[in-house]
């Protein structure tokens, strides 16, 4: 097992921070604004940057395998797992489907939920044309069940740090479910916050991931550093 934490410069991405790497997987701290897979913008996705990095680092001829296991929304930062082998990709996909990967997110909101911790249950339907998810308290045609657990970790003068554990994986789930209880994420104009963040991000990060390695069977437990921002640094101190 090789633990690493360093930045990789490329022509199209300011940096790529590798948190963990071995022969089968790579875990990257995605910066807000980056895309994991290609989209209609034509911007280079993180998977391609990583593929080029692997090719150059190990002087690999020909095509390099790099499989996308899961994604984060463009304005969200934090941990993303990639597979370096087809065996790892197949097993990780199965683990994600079976709920065997534990992911924890941190969010900043101007508002507090009614209870300091709890579980949110509802239904989400995604409108692809507008790239937005709609939330319903009861079942609706075309909507899928969405569940998460949350806990308020602490409060600053104007913002509150909320820890979220996803129990299902729906598009924009954390964003829409926190907004449904009056707690839109800081900077998330799409789901009800009133002011954007200067860098276009929203104040949501994939903070922690834990799973059994798909090949070695060792337990992997990783944390993403919080963004280099005074508000996030202050929020992080609430947990210490």
Locate predicted features:
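RNA pseudouridine synthases
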Residues: 1-240
């Amino acid at each position: 097992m090789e633990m690493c934490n360093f930045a990789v410069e490329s022509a199209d991405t300011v940096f790529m921070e590798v948190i963990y790497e071995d022969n089968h997987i790579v875990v990257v701290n995605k910066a807000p604004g980056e895309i994991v897979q290609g989209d209609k913008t034509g911007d280079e996705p993180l998977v391609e940057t990583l593929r080029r990095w692997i090719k150059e680092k190990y002087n690999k001829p020909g095509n390099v395998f790099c499989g996308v296991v899961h994604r984060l929304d463009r304005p969200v930062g934090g941990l993303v797992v990639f597979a370096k082998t087809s065996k790892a990709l197949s097993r990780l996909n199965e683990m994600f489907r079976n709920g065997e990967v534990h992911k924890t997110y941190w969010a900043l909101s101007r508002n507090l939920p009614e209870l300091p911790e709890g579980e949110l249950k509802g239904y989400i339907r995604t409108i692809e044309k507008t790239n937005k998810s709609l939330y319903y308290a009861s079942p609706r045609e075309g909507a899928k069940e969405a569940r998460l657990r949350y806990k308020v970790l602490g409060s600053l003068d104007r913002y509150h740090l909320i820890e979220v554990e996803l129990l299902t994986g729906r598009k924009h789930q954390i964003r829409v479910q926190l907004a449904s209880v009056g707690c839109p994420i800081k900077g998330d104009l799409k789901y009800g916050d009133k002011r954007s963040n200067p860098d276009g991000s929203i104040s949501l990060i994939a903070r922690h991931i834990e799973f059994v390695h798909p090949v070695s069977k060792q337990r992997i437990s990783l944390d993403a550093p919080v963004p280099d921002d005074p508000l996030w640094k202050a929020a992080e101190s609430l947990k210490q």
